Amino acid sequence: MTRRTLAWLALNHLPGAGAVTLRRLVSRFGSPEAALEAPVHELVALGSLTPDQARAVERLALDCAHFEELGRRLHAAGTRLLTLEDDDYPPHLRLLRDAPPLLYVRGSLLPRDAVAVAVVGTRTPSPQGAAAAAEVGESLAARGMTVVSGLALGVDGAAHRGALAAGRSIAVLGSGIDRVTPAKHEGLAAQIARSGALLSELPPGTRATRETLLARNRIQAGLTKVVIVVQCRDRGGSFATARRALQAGRPVLAIRWEEPEFAGGVERLEKTGARVVRQVEAVAAAADAASAPLPCPAQAEMALGDAPDVDYAW
């Protein structure tokens, strides 16, 4: 592990600091190593950290041996550390103003993953919705696209299983890389890691919370060129994923359902800017969108300096 990666690993453990805060911190001091070595008063003067956080940075800098040992344990467990500065960092994710500065990766990321589609939806789909998620996942993978989802119960799990039947899948965790949530998907996670990848931005040992799961949704949107919402009600995490995709200029497809339980979700997504399609149209529409170029970064996201103070932290 390089000295720079070690510094990113240490900063990733700063309490209450999310991706935007960490990127501003490193931008101000020029490198993660310099940020760790900065005097407390300069850290406070930056305006992004509280005095307690600034003192915590100082403590992290003094604990290099701990993070070196953590790095060795992660490597032994098959986990790679990938920083925003690495050439093989996911290219579409890099465009987000709040892209994670550090990813924990179990499995492999390949160049072909640049053509990826997120398949998301409710944790409690109808039997028809679960079947649709599996069919869409398998059809996308059979066309050579990587299927991205969040490993949750319901639509996510069905989409992952469908994709694995024909190709690759990536699961974005809302917990540490060593804490699969839900636990009943540990076997599925192992399958995904063997042929695709598990990703997390969270320090090892972090438990999933509402906040970390919401933060996870932006990564799903950022990794992909198009999002398919298979089935959802009129609220939930699918809307967060769809909103971030649309903000980044990436299309969202919502599969139409006539059942009252799910019709409201489709209607709300359409008002948000999603294109409503029938299931039989979804895969072809996603393939067309995935083959189109992404908007240039200036159009897709605000510059880091213009990013709002809202930050995902844990």
Question: How should these model regions be labeled?
Answer:
Residues 1-86, 272:
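Short, small/acidic-rich helices and loops at N termini and domain boundaries
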Residues 1-5, 84-314:
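Glycine-biased, small-residue-rich flexible motifs in mid-sequence functional cores and linkers
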